[in-house]
Amino acid sequence: MNPHDLEWLNRIGERKDIMLAVLLLAVVFMMVLPLPPLVLDILIAVNMTISVVLLMIAIYINSPLQFSAFPAVLLVTTLFRLALSVSTTRMILLQADAGQIVYTFGNFVVGGNFIVGIVIFLIITIVQFLVITKGSERVAEVSARFSLDAMPGKQMSIDGDMRAGVIDVNEARERRATIEKESQMFGSMDGAMKFVKGDAIAGLIIIFVNILGGVTIGVTQKGLAAAEALQLYSILTVGDGMVSQVPALLIAITAGIIVTRVSSEDSSDLGSDIGKQVVAQPKAMLIGGVLLLLFGLIPGFPTVTFLILALLVGCGGYMLSRKQSRNDEANQDLQSLLTSGSGAPAARTKAKTSGANKGRLGEQEAFAMTVPLLIDVDSSQQEALEAIALNDELVRVRRALYLDLGVPFPGIHLRFNEGMGEGEYLISLQEVPVARGELKAGYLLVRESVSQLELLGIPYEKGEHLLPDQETFWVSVEYEERLEKSQLEFFSHSQVLTWHLSHVLREYAEDFIGIQETRYLLEQMEGGYGELIKEVQRIVPLQRMTEILQRLVGEDISIRNMRSILEAMVEWGQKEKDVVQLTEYIRSSLKRYICYKYANGNNILPAYLFDQEVEEKIRSGVRQTSAGSYLALDPAVTESLLEQVRKTIGDLSQIQSKPVLIVSMDIRRYVRKLIESEYYGLPVLSYQELTQQINIQPLGRVCL
């Protein structure tokens, strides 16, 4: 074949749309025009080839979505097969000849016996119709329904992963497209299985019509005896039916494989999946070998055959069991190697890479980013911490904090570490510990006062100060029922972790708002507030926007109301270039939320106030530079101010209603920085952040 011919074939292969159109037109002409036997043989061979190729594709695809065009292919192949049946029927009735393949199927395959042919044809048709097609149709129907019902949950899961930073926007878009494609695929398969079902029914009808029509034509028009006509036309009709039903059966098997395929991330072809899952159960093979041996001992059964099978299955199970045991021992040795030592991230990474890169020490190490959020727990607590309950608690905490602050916190990594003290746990941000605590085996954590526990006669042990202004106590689990009856709040080990973690996340929330997260929040709003997003990006650079959001969440102000925040940025962004002051204007635009948050839904706000002289002293200490503003008070003045704050406010943990501190807007941020080391939980508000409906309940005034 010369290069010109190859180029011509390549051009034809590139125009797949034209090839499909030609095929569909050919199907129509096959129903109308009579075809010679040679052409029929070619078309029948093509039909068989298509069915075999489709079956092989179904076996080797990793997921049904890799052959999402199959419903349309099923329609085309069904039409092609029916058109072929019409053409062969025409040739059988007109010329008593439908080509060499039909004749061979009628004589050689069924031995020229009409009864045998009918029986084989009926068996194939019944298997296809009642077994394969019926089951595949039901599976497709259920898959379509479940796929549609699961779409909202999958979409929410994708959104959660994207907020947590597990995936980026592009991957989230791809996953959503995959879910939509999967739903359409199974919905189409639900309808396409009706083609296979109808094809089987049509095959049954066609064969009986052909026999009846052939005998009638043979007797009335060709002068044949009834028995002779029946023998001639029935053999050809059975051959035609077999030629049609064998590819139809292969197509039905293909459809069944595709709709019943359960795909996962580590899926490969069907044979590999079946092989891996079968050999993963060596005990089942050993038991199967014993059962086969017992079958061989039954009188009358072929003993040698069953003994050989029992030997093969049993030996296979034994060898797989030995191999699995060796792998488990190797994994345990590797795990003990990785978990020994201090458990520090650097040491652990070194252990892993030294084993993986043995003999390749000269190669460059792969870049590994730090884990954003990590909980290290003493390995002895692994059984006490129920995995499912802990996972539910962690998901609940992330969800609650997102609804409260609007911060897309990342996924939480839990690691059991043998190098830690008994019951100890560490909470780390970017693999740097920021909080620690202890879990006491057989005890519950209680936050109630000592007097309540003593009143109930419950013995206790004083726990650590997990939070600055909260005392905790350990109570034995045997008093759990008494605590429940007394309606005293207590925490299990899983709840202690999540409770402590929630406070840590709230304290360090601003660390989880970066440029990437800010970009994500803007992209989430583009669909409904496109013009607002364009305007705010024109006025406020992304870096300044990020800093503003960090300052808001750093003081426990939710950023879920992004529309109001962005509107305020547009309003004040051109007038005010100082990020600190711009944040104050944005806070004033959130006054309804702030008042509702700190007044607990009431119109009365318990508050401490600063004397005018104190405010002037702070105002005089503010310094403006090109890099921004800061508070520069004399150390003696700073200590004097803090001492007056301590005298006025005292111990916040002893105050039932949570108060706030109210100062002027221009010094609010500096006052917050001044007192946050000692009064982190005391919100500092400005008068501009109060609505008209709020009534201030003064609790005290800080004076010099």
From Swiss-Prot:
The chain crosses the membrane at residues 20-40, 42-62, 67-87, 112-132, 200-220, 238-258, 290-310. It is a multi-pass membrane protein. It is found in: Cell inner membrane. It comes from Yersinia enterocolitica. Belongs to the FHIPEP (flagella/HR/invasion proteins export pore) family. One of its GO terms (biological process) is protein secretion. The keyword Protein transport applies. This is Low calcium response locus protein D. Could be involved in the secretion of the yop virulence proteins. The keyword DNA-binding does not apply. It comes from the Bacteria. Keywords: Cell inner membrane, Cell membrane, Membrane, Plasmid, Protein transport, Transmembrane, Transmembrane helix, Transport, Virulence. Signal peptide: none annotated. GO terms for cellular component: plasma membrane. PROSITE patterns: FHIPEP.
